[in-house]
Amino acid sequence: QGYEYVLDKDELVRKAAVRAVELLGARPVQAGQYPVVIDQLLAGVFIHEAFGHLSEADFVYENPKARKMMPLGRRFGQDILNVYDDGSIPNLRGTTLYDDEGTPARRNWLIQNGVLVGRLHSRQTAAKMGETASGNARAVNYRFAPIVRMTNTAIDNGTATFEDMIKDIKLGIYACDAYGGETQLENFSFSSSYAYMIRDGRIAEMVKDVILAGNLFTTLGNIDMIGNDFKWLNT
C-alpha cells in the first residue's frame, strides 16, 4: 500500500510541464485590490496557516492579544463559512486514531455558520481554559512533550459552482496553488504558483508573481461564496 501516491501520475506531470511553459510567457500581475477566487489547494494553505494556527490553544492561552482576538462566539464571516479540523478521516496526512495523549481523534468544528465555536486542545490547555480536549496533542517523538497542533483542517464544502463565483467579476484574479507565504498574527501574505485574470466573468490570460496579502478577519468577513467542489489534496 502507498504506491497509489506515486503511480499513474503521467497526466499530473504533463500538466505541470505545460504550465511551466505557459508561465515563461506570463506577465507579472499589476498590483492592486481585486476580487479573488482561490483554488482548493490555496484555500487549504490559507485556512491552515492564517486561521488554523490561531486556533491552537497553547498559542491562544499564552498570548493575550490572541485571546482577545479569538473569543468563542465572535462572528468571523457569513453563515456560509464553516471550518473544521478532523484527525479521524482515513488516509490523510494528519490522520491518527488517537493523539499523543491518548485522546481519540474526531471532527472539531472551529467555525460554524460564520461564528467561532471551538479551538484545538491538548489535555493541558483544555484544563487551563476550562474546555474539552480535542485530540490535537502531537509530539515529534518520545523525546518531546506533546504540543497542540492541527490534524486535517479545511473549509467545509459550499454550494457555489466555479461559474457562479466568476460570472459577476468584471476584473479579478483566479489564484492557484501555493508557492509560499507567511503570517504575523492576523496578517498574512501568500504567493500563488500561478494565476489567471478574470475579465467580464471569464477566465482570461495567465499571470505570475501573484501575492495575496491582507488581514485574516477582514478576509473571512469578505467571503461571499464557497465552492461545491471540495477535495482533499495530499501534497
Annotate each language-model stretch with its function.
Residues Q1-T235:
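N-terminal small-residue-enriched
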